[in-house]
Amino acid sequence: MATTSAAVLNGLSSSFLTGGNKSQALLAAPLAARVGGAATPKRFTVLAAAAKKSWIPAVRGGGNLVDPEWLDGSLPGDYGFDPLGLGKDPAFLKWYREAELIHGRWAMAAVLGIFVGQAWSGIPWFEAGADPGAIAPFSFGTLLGTQLILMGWVESKRWVDFFDPDSQSVEWATPWSKTAENFANFTGEQGYPGGKFFDPLALAGTLNNGVYVPDTEKLERLKVAEIKHARLAMLAMLIFYFEAGQGKTPLGALGL
């Protein structure tokens, strides 16, 4: 009996079955108390925790290089890639995730604009601003100043909202909007406001009688898809910059 119980305990020590030290201790303690004595048959279920995905497939271990302890897989698209340890501080991790999300969204818009713009006009994206007719009847200084003012206003609101969530969804902060409700955070998560204004097609929610209701399942799925496409777009833009340095366009590099 003792031999059999020891074998069972040894099997329960496998993280493959129990998924963690805490689960192993909870399951092994009752059995250890009964080693060498009569045991009363009881039913119990062993739950295997889902393995955390790694940015290096089929590789386990490696310490914080492969599986950083400060990345627990709770963030969308988190595969444990942080070789420089930038996310050790929770405050910095939150800021870097916000930065990744915003830069990724701009990169996705830029990649689409580069392909569509060149296909439509035939002008390489890195030469588009050199065409005086492209910005007529406005001067370059006028466009630059307008963009700085408008972008500065929007970015300042995003900056303030990051440190003081929902502070910008009030009437005084949105004077040109009929209701501040359009800018409220419907999902309760930073960077994913949702609502009719930011999700007019209700891709991450539903519209019931004109009222936006977020759908957690759809939102989680779309967050992972978005961050994956955002990372690909940022990588694509890096490649586009190298190609532009050689006087090539993305379509030209593909022989199109």
From Swiss-Prot:
Compartment(s) where it occurs, according to its Swiss-Prot or TrEMBL record: Plastid, Chloroplast thylakoid membrane
Keyword vocabulary terms for this entry: Chlorophyll, Chloroplast, Chromophore, Membrane, Photosynthesis, Photosystem II, Plastid, Thylakoid, Transit peptide, Transmembrane, Transmembrane helix
GO biological processes: photosynthesis, light harvesting in photosystem I; response to light stimulus
One Gene Ontology molecular-function label: chlorophyll binding
Disulfide bonds: none
Domain of life of the native organism: Eukaryota
Entry-linked Gene3D superfamilies: Chlorophyll a/b binding protein domain
Listed InterPro entries: Chloro_AB-bd_pln (IPR001344), Chloroa_b-bind (IPR022796)
Gene Ontology annotations for the cellular component aspect, listed alphabetically: chloroplast thylakoid membrane; photosystem II
Transmembrane portions of the chain: 106-126, 134-154
Pfam families: Chloroa_b-bind
Topology in membrane: Multi-pass membrane protein
Similarity comment: family membership: Belongs to the ELIP/psbS family.
Name recorded for this polypeptide: Chlorophyll a-b binding protein CP24 10A, chloroplastic
Organism: Solanum lycopersicum (Tomato)
